[in-house]
């Protein structure tokens, strides 16, 4: 099947399935599972590197992991996160950094923020770089929103998120992630814009869903309440490594078929 492009994402084409991946083998696996989009998320800082938040993720981190995912040559669309302070300093810095991610193999970039970053989105789109928006809970701004909690419960917040969605739409995003907002607000935003909305922790009314792979397969110690675990890979790893350790200590591995004289 041909690789997907941003033109394949539009309203009314079913529910889009997105998931994160950060390296070659997981990108290959999730693509073979049939997802529509792969996000090389700055969440890698927390789920891979053990950081307490995403603020410490660098452009070098994002370029390296985007390259790894792109080497899997996935059919799915590959979107790379723009990390903290890679675009906030102005349109030209944003363009330079977004171009690095595209050269690393991303089909598009994602950036957090609403109306205030619409000019940056517009600059990137005019330069030929597709952009996915991200509003609601924006993890790079957890210090200013009081932590990792639901956003959009007050009338002021709801109005701001709606304004943000429309501003991003007008700036040219091809899609918008809505993170951890009330389902009723996600439905309102989805009805208000003509680009696909992708929910994470925001209910069933968006045009698609996205989750962090490590939450889905059971590799996260404390997954968010809105995630669902579909497998327990951590338990499988513990079991496999325990058996390996036991066989080494008992002299059962390597067996004759595992080596040559």
Curated annotation (Swiss-Prot):
A single MF term (Gene Ontology): magnesium ion binding
RNA-binding is among the record's keywords: no
Binding site for Mg(2+): 42, 81, 112
Pfam family, one: Pantoate_transf
Catalytic residues identified in the record: 179 (proton acceptor)
Keyword Glycosyltransferase: no
GO cellular component: cytoplasm
Residues bound to 3-methyl-2-oxobutanoate: 42-43, 81, 110
PANTHER family (UniProt xref): 3-METHYL-2-OXOBUTANOATE HYDROXYMETHYLTRANSFERASE
Family per record: Belongs to the PanB family.
Function as written in the Swiss-Prot or TrEMBL entry: Catalyzes the reversible reaction in which hydroxymethyl group from 5,10-methylenetetrahydrofolate is transferred onto alpha-ketoisovalerate to form ketopantoate.
Protein name listed in UniProt: 3-methyl-2-oxobutanoate hydroxymethyltransferase
């Amino acid at each position: 099947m041909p690789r997907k492009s941003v033109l394949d994402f539009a309203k009314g084409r079913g529910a889009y399935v997105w998931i994160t991946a950060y390296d070659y083998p997981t990108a290959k696996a999730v693509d073979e599972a049939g997802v529509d989009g792969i996000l090389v998320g700055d969440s890698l800082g927390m789920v891979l590197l053990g950081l307490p938040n995403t603020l410490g993720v660098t452009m070098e981190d994002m370029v390296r992991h985007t390259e790894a995912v792109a080497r899997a040559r996935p059919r799915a669309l590959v979107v790379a996160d723009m990390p903290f302070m890679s675009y906030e300093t102005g349109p030209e810095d944003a363009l330079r950094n977004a171009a690095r991610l595209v050269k690393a193999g991303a089909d598009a970039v994602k950036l957090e923020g609403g109306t205030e970053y619409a000019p940056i989105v517009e600059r990137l789109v005019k330069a030929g770089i597709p952009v996915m928006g991200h509003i609601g809970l924006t993890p790079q701004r957890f210090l200013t929103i009081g932590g990792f909690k639901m956003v959009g419960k007050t009338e002021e917040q709801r109005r701001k998120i709606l304004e943000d969605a429309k501003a991003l739409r007008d700036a040219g995003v091809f899609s918008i992630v809505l993170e951890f907002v009330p389902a009723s607000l996600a439905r309102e935003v989805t009805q208000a814009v003509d680009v696909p909305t992708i929910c994470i922790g925001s209910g069933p009314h968006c045009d698609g869903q996205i989750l962090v792979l490590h939450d889905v397969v059971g590799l996260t110690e404390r997954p968010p309440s809105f995630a669902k675990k579909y497998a327990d890979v951590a338990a499988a790893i513990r079991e496999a490594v325990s058996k390996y350790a036991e066989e080494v200590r008992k002299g059962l591995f390597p067996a004759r078929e595992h080596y040559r004289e």
